[in-house]
Amino acid sequence: MIAELVFVGTELLLGEILNTNAQYLSRQLAQLGVDVYHQVVVGDNAARLRAVLSQALSRSDLVIASGGLGPTDDDITREVAAEVTGRPLELDPQLLAQLEIWFARRGRRMAENNRRQCMVPRGARVLPNDRGTAPGLMIPADGDKVVILLPGPPGELRPMFEAHVAPYLAARSGGRPLRLVTRTLRFVGIGESALADGLRDLMATQTDPTIAPYAKVAEVHLRLATRAADEAEGYARIAPLEAEIRSRFGRFLYGSDEETLPQAVGRLLAERGMTLSTAESCTGGLVAKWITDVPGSSRYFGTGFVTYANEAKVSLLGVPEELLSAHGAVSEPVARAMAEGALQRSGADVAVAVSGIAGPDGGTPEKPVGTVCFALAGRGRQGGGPLPAGTWAETLWLHGDRDGVRERAAVHALAMVRRYLLGYLD
């Protein structure tokens, strides 16, 4: 079954409202084995909505439209859908009585324009709305096609979809539909183009499962996807491809599916029984925040230093003033001293430090905005896989605005810790 999603509302086009319904409906339909080929956002204009719905019905079996079911003049979805499907609107007395009761129970008088919400295309099925006044509608179209209208507010759309639309689609499939099963592999320390180049042969011949790379902030994700009757069958089909990718790029692969980089680093620290400390300047505590966002992080994280000013670097971390004078705060020697000071003063097993120029000001020709210095100091470890003692430093030039530089720096700091714990830091 091929579906098209239509989202109605000028506020969506203006960016005043985030269209979370698009993500929700796409995910739900994928789980039901329904292919979504198109998504369209259209404003509150009858002519344009008429054209969009007509085109959708010409190329899809199922059209789901959300929004525009309210009582005001710009709520036009019901009327336009009735026109496009050739089904005249008729007042539903039962729906009207229910709506009058809904208002009476809340001590409110029903306005005359609310009667519009009780107009139903002839032959359509009404989908009850337990959260609001706008019922959904399931309207038959030419052939075996159907147009489903859902309210725009997510708090009304989601329960209506789950209670009425999902069971209808499952029954319509005539058995166990093939569902979309995916595995997301998460990489750090490698770019999208380099990863894609190393998988060129696999991507050139992909049929089932499919491979789709997409870039995130300082990360790359690979989505492996197949259709199967259930998750077990799907994951079994994905497993050989995943194993091949891991054999090629396991050094950069930190996790899968919903595991984040802070979770992956925390898992490695916990497995080794080690603790981490942070010393941050330009990131302002972002690395420590991400680490402590993970429940149970107190097992491996105890101390984080935010030393934004040079005075704080000296007093809290013991960075020598002459080092700051000679090299500047954004330098590998200072980053090394920050990491070593955090290691010594926290008692942790490993410490990571970040010092950079996030912008928009502060850059120079020698050290432009985006220059970030990193350092990691480790005490070393013999058991559970030996780790060397020492201090390592590196410098990156990161792109983006102030927040972008800070976020990319935080990702790289965590990636540096991961590399050390896995023995890749050299």
UniProtKB/Swiss-Prot annotation:
The record's listing under InterPro entries reads:
CinA, CinA-like_C, CinA_C, CinA_KH, Competence-induced_CinA, MoaB/Mog-like_dom_sf, MoaB/Mog_dom
SMART domains recorded for this chain?
MoCF_biosynth
On the tree of life, the source organism's domain of life is Bacteria
> What SUPFAM superfamilies does the record point to?
CinA-like, Molybdenum cofactor biosynthesis proteins
Q: Which CDD domains would you find in this protein's record? A: cinA (cd00885)
| Family assignment from sequence similarity | Belongs to the CinA family.
Query: Record's HAMAP family?
Result: CinA_B
Record-given protein name = Putative competence-damage inducible protein
- Specify the species: Symbiobacterium thermophilum (strain DSM 24528 / JCM 14929 / IAM 14863 / T)
Chain's gene name: cinA
